[in-house]
Amino acid sequence: MSHCGKKTTFDAIRYSDAPPCFTHTMCEALYPGHPRAKTDEQLEHIARNGGMIGITALGYFVGSDPGGKTNIETYLDHIDHAVRLVGVDHVGLSSDFQVQGIRPWATKENWYEPRLKSFKPSYNVKWPPWIPELDSTDRFLNVTYGLFKRGYSDSAIRKILGLNWMRYFEQIIGL
């Protein structure tokens, strides 16, 4: 449902027998006008139905200036907003790209230019697309440290880093 519009999202939540999920999204309250951002009302409906919200780490999805003013703090602001809104049990990490990051393989020619042609201008695709602190395997350590600095407990950090996703998948597929 991360790619769905508002009506489809609410219909899917209403008619789903299983807890719904945004696998990779961000908070419209912090990045208004981005077509992939979800409203507080959508996030609340997901949580109310036992679902999960994965906050994406793709730079131009969480802020307007990836590689510049959009940084790890911007990303953590989205996590904070979602946690304050729906509770820590419904929020997790999401990258929307592979573990080694984008920088090791992406070039303007093979990554940026195709997206400029295929994505709507409202997606605000920028080069470079990554947030430096989130574009390597160290991203999980950087997020952990950032959440710790913001006062999150060890238990809350573990949930956000993966325990919430494990619980969700156990619930959905019965692991």
State the predicted function of each range.
Residues 47-72:
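A conserved active-site cap/scaffold subdomain adjacent to cofactor or substrate pockets
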Residues 86-111, 115-119, 123-133:
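Short acidic/histidine-rich active-site segments
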Residues 4-7, 25-28, 58-60, 96-100:
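Active-site beta-loop-alpha junctions enriched in small/polar residues
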Residues 1-21, 34-51, 73-89:
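Histidine/acidic residue-rich metal-binding segments in metalloenzymes
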Residues 24, 53, 96, 157:
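Conserved, mostly hydrophobic/aromatic
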Residues 25-39, 53, 67-69:
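Glycine-rich tight-turn/loop motif centered on a GG-T
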Residues 125-175:
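Mid-to-C-terminal alpha-helical segments outside catalytic/metal-binding sites
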Residues 67-68, 102-108, 169-175:
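Short glycine/threonine-rich loop-to-helix capping motif typified by GTGT followed
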